[in-house]
Amino acid sequence: MSTEVSNESPVTVDEAEFAALARYVLDQLHVHPQAELSILFVDIPAMSDLHERWMDEPGPTDVLSFPMDELRPGRDDAPSGPGVLGDVVLCPEVAAEQARTAGHSTEEELLLLTTHGILHLLGFDHAEPDEEREMFDLQRKLLLTFLAGR
């Protein structure tokens, strides 16, 4: 699996940790080992621009996902095919504020948001209550098992 992590934000992040999380999540969801994923950390002005351009919403947001090849989770006996999963774009400065409100570290918030973004790339959504429950339960399970294995 090819995971590229780039930091264009003023906040220091452990790029290797986010690449490891991505590998873990994609392995757990049986995504083809040759799938490509990009994780990009940006500053507030860049995130505001992306948020307005792609979501028609003003101001920055915490995470945006840009799917490419519409890959879906596979199964033990049938992993997904290879392809370009897409891009997850995160704003550490927005995440830091959310982390303060939630009472945990910025890194934990960014790991949560990265997991959330990857699930969106795989077709998960939270527009409806049942979808939200499924996505957030899976997100929590994946993140907790990743953190427990560190």
Curated annotation (Swiss-Prot):
Keyword Zinc on entry: yes
Enzyme Commission number(s): 3.1.-.-
GO MF terms held by the record: metalloendopeptidase activity; RNA endonuclease activity; zinc ion binding
Swiss-Prot/TrEMBL cofactor(s): Zn(2+)
Positions with a binding annotation for Zn(2+): H116, H120, H126
Pfam families: YbeY
Enzyme class: hydrolase
Gene3D superfamilies: Metalloproteases ('zincins'), catalytic domain (3.40.390.30)
GO biological process entries: rRNA processing
Keywords of this entry: Cytoplasm, Endonuclease, Hydrolase, Metal-binding, Nuclease, Ribosome biogenesis, rRNA processing, Zinc
Chief location category: cytoplasm
Cofactor details (free text): Binds 1 zinc ion.
Record's GO cellular component terms: cytoplasm
Classification via InterPro entries: MetalPrtase_cat_dom_sf_prd, YbeY, YbeY_CS
Subcellular localization, as worded in the UniProt entry: Cytoplasm
SUPFAM superfamilies: Metalloproteases ('zincins'), catalytic domain
Family note: Belongs to the endoribonuclease YbeY family.
Function (record text): Single strand-specific metallo-endoribonuclease involved in late-stage 70S ribosome quality control and in maturation of the 3' terminus of the 16S rRNA.
NCBIfam families linked: rRNA maturation RNase YbeY (TIGR00043)
Record's protein name: Endoribonuclease YbeY
Lineage of the species this protein comes from: Bacteria, Bacillati, Actinomycetota, Actinomycetes, Micrococcales
Underlying gene: ybeY
